[in-house]
């Protein structure tokens, strides 16, 4: 847990994990086979907790009789993608994001924004990432609690796109962690968008995945 970084979402983890674990066990008991959607912060670690706890037997051992990984999905990236698009419309330096950019990772400090996949600029991408991450703090400085934008962009709108089988931003299971990326739900399972990622962008994504993996 990276509480020392000041990321409020990580400070929420222990409390929300207990609640997530409770409902994960209920899903196990009901042999639930639908989607288990997580919208509470921090989304990605909580998704992992849901998957783990649903597969834990009453004796504490893992028996893998609970949810499948493809059933668990987190919704936190949509609002960060929307915030990046907002700043891209305001600042011509970031305009390429609107047609060529992508958002990855968690809803928080380890967010990864790429200004463009085709013409990736690491410095610009990091600046746009910082703008999106700090948007919450700017709203709070103005005296508002930012909850409407996440409820729409990460919640309602992304959930509807997901249920319709359309492309959207959400967190899915990937190499042992839940990671936000553009994907869609097909009858055959989850389809992640496959892109030729620049090496610098791959390195940023690996750092984020390693940090997510370290959260217990």
Features from the language model and the residues they span:
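Rossmann-like dinucleotide-binding core of oxidoreductases
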Residues: 35-115
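Rossmann-like NAD(P)-binding element
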Residues: 1-35
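Short amphipathic alpha-helical segments, especially helix-boundary/capping motifs
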Residues: 23-27, 62-63, 129-136
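Long, compositionally biased stretches enriched for glycine and/or charged residues
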Residues: 87-216
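Hydrophobic, Leu/Ile/Phe/Ala-enriched alpha-helical segments that form helix-helix packing faces
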Residues: 23-31, 50-58, 156-163, 212, ...
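Short, charged/polar micro-motifs that form catalytic or ligand-binding hotspots
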Residues: 13, 36, 40, 146
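Conserved active-site and cofactor/substrate-binding residues in soluble primary-metabolism enzymes
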Residues: 14-18, 22, 45, 151-158, ...
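Short, solvent-exposed loop/turn segments at secondary-structure junctions
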Residues: 4, 45-46, 146
């Amino acid at each position: 847990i990276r509480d020392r970084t000041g990321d409020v979402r990580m400070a929420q983890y222990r409390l929300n994990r207990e609640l997530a674990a409770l409902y994960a066990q209920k899903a196990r008991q009901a042999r639930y086979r639908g989607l288990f959607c997580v919208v509470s912060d921090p989304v990605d670690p909580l998704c992992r907790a849901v998957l783990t706890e649903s597969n834990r037997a009453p004796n504490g051992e893992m028996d893998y009789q609970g949810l499948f990984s493809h059933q668990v999905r987190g919704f936190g990236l949509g609002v960060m993608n929307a915030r990046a698009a907002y700043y891209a419309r305001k600042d011509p330096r970031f305009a390429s994001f609107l047609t060529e950019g992508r958002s990855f990772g968690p809803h928080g400090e380890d967010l990864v924004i790429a200004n463009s996949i085709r013409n990736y600029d690491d410095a610009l991408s990091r600046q746009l990432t910082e703008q999106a991450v700090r948007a919450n703090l700017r709203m709070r400085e103005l005296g508002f609690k930012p909850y409407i934008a996440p409820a729409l962009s990460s919640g309602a709108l992304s959930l509807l796109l997901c249920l319709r089988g359309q492309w959207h931003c959400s967190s899915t299971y990937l190499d042992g962690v839940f990671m936000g990326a553009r994907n869609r739900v097909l009858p055959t399972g989850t389809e992640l968008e496959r892109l030729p990622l620049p090496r610098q962008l791959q390195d940023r994504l690996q750092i984020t995945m390693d940090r997510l993996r370290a959260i217990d």
